[in-house]
Amino acid sequence: MSENSLTITEILSSIRTLLVKHNKAKVTQIEKELLQAVAELEKKFKQQVQNFNELQQKIPNLQKVNEEFRLKVEKIQEEAQKKIQEKVAELTIKSKEELENAKKYVIEKSIDQPLIIIDQFEIALSYAQKDPQVKNYTTGFNMVLDAFSRWLEGFGVTKIAIEPGAQFDEKVMAALEVVPSDQPANTVVKVSKSGYKLHDKVIRFASVVVSQGNKTE
């Protein structure tokens, strides 16, 4: 029995001596309740001691868990930082590529008018072959057309080379008309308007007349 229990027992003995003459049953009840309270306190105290001992045993394990957790957190931080750096590098490269493409194709929106001028010179040259009065101007027309074409080439604009007899290619051609012809089906009979590329991008499809083949076949 602990010191606290002995002290309470002595108190109970004194109380019993003082009150035994007045109410023996009441004293017995009080004594019983106090003894129960003491027993409960002792039980709780022993439980707390046991809990404390168990906690002391767990401390090394807790330290190990904390160290493992710290290492995991550091690993996650390193991986996150690596992914962020990769994403930044990717966005930087993408931004540079987009900027280069923007520079590369900036002329696209304003190229229509120069191409119309070239079309007019090409039409004039085609008529010049038939009209002797205009034929005298072909040399000058060709010089201007060549100079203008070279100027456009400086911006990356080039004519798509298509000749009659070529196979129709929907990637660079648009069929204005399909006509009977001695040439094989799906063959270019005539180039009505030249097509152009800006670097590797088709900015205007060539307008062509396409053969449907010989009707007698």
Swiss-Prot record:
SUPFAM superfamilies: Coiled-coil domain of nucleotide exchange factor GrpE (SSF58014), Head domain of nucleotide exchange factor GrpE (SSF51064). It comes from the Bacteria. The gene is grpE. Its main location: cytoplasm. It is found in: Cytoplasm. Pfam families: GrpE. Keywords: Chaperone, Cytoplasm, Stress response. One of its GO terms (cellular component) is cytoplasm. This is Protein GrpE. PROSITE patterns: GRPE (PS01071). The keyword Ubl conjugation does not apply. One of its GO terms (molecular function) is protein-folding chaperone binding. GO terms for biological process: protein folding. Homodimer. Participates actively in the response to hyperosmotic and heat shock by preventing the aggregation of stress-denatured proteins, in association with DnaK and GrpE. It is the nucleotide exchange factor for DnaK and may function as a thermosensor. Unfolded proteins bind initially to DnaJ; upon interaction with the DnaJ-bound protein, DnaK hydrolyzes its bound ATP, resulting in the formation of a stable complex. GrpE releases ADP from DnaK; ATP binding to DnaK triggers the release of the substrate protein, thus completing the reaction cycle. It comes from Mycoplasma pneumoniae (strain ATCC 29342 / M129 / Subtype 1) (Mycoplasmoides pneumoniae).
